[in-house]
Amino acid sequence: MRNKLLYILGAAMLLVSCGTEIGENERLEYVAPAAVGKNVLLVDFTGQRCVNCPKANEEIESLQKQYGGDTVIAVGMHSGPLGFKGTPKVLGLATDLGDTYYNHWGVEYQPTGVIDYLGKVDYTAWAANVTERLKKQTTVSISATTEGEGTDLHGNVSVEFSDAMVRGKLQLWLVEDSITAMQLMPDGSPNKDYVHMHVFRDAINGTWGQDLTAVNAMGWNPVVPYQYTLNESWNRKHLWLIAFVYDDSGVLQVIRKHL
């Protein structure tokens, strides 16, 4: 009888505690993720001799884990004084074209990012800037095909404008994932087995792309053909086509397409 009474009293106390009102400041509220209005292009000016660049890569990984690699599209632009173009024995990832972009944007240190072609951003501020750009609405949609075998690459890029009086440029880049090459780490030590992702390889249609103009043409949908001969040393299975449309207001839309 005594045990039964203790059980009843315990249950009553539990019910009372469960019914205790939680203060307004103590309640957990669900915060929905920001709605995505467009994809975002993040150009990471990086280098194999840049000790802080692995930290920037971690920031990219975090953003892509949160939003997806098809939404936050990264390009590792190996360039500048900390870039490395290689020797006969050591693989380098920097390019002359990468240096051209580096100088154009006036990059002063690495790692530095350029988000949606809107200017330089320190990697510690990438998350906030990317989040804001994701909220922007766009009037441009892009789709692409990638065809060919071996070193042959060809296809079409379709750009649809849902607004009149649209002007911009279409830029096509190639990037490669999963390249094992030397990288200086934050402690200054060289890591010969570092895996580099989204490494810029080349621009398919010129340094600054090609003009696209739609004047009073609601729903105009140009189809742009392209053709390119791949470097034999690149791994086709790890290559991506990056296609984006930009104007003076920045990148209007960007996509990536696996080869």
Where are these regions (language model features)?
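Short N-terminal helix-initiation segments at or just after the protein's N-terminus
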Residues: 19-23, 54-57, 186-190
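Intrinsically disordered, low-complexity boundary segments flanking structured domains
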Residues: 27-29, 60-65, 101, 127-132
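Intrinsically disordered, low-complexity segments enriched in small/polar residues
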Residues: 5, 28, 65, 192, ...
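Local sequence-structure signature of Cys/Sec-based thiol-disulfide redox active-site neighborhoods
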Residues: 31-80
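Bacterial Sec-dependent N-terminal signal peptides
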Residues: 1-41, 51
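Small-side-chain structural scaffolding
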Residues: 17, 46-47, 56, 113, ...
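Short, conserved sequence motifs used for protein processing/export or organelle targeting and
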Residues: 70, 76-259
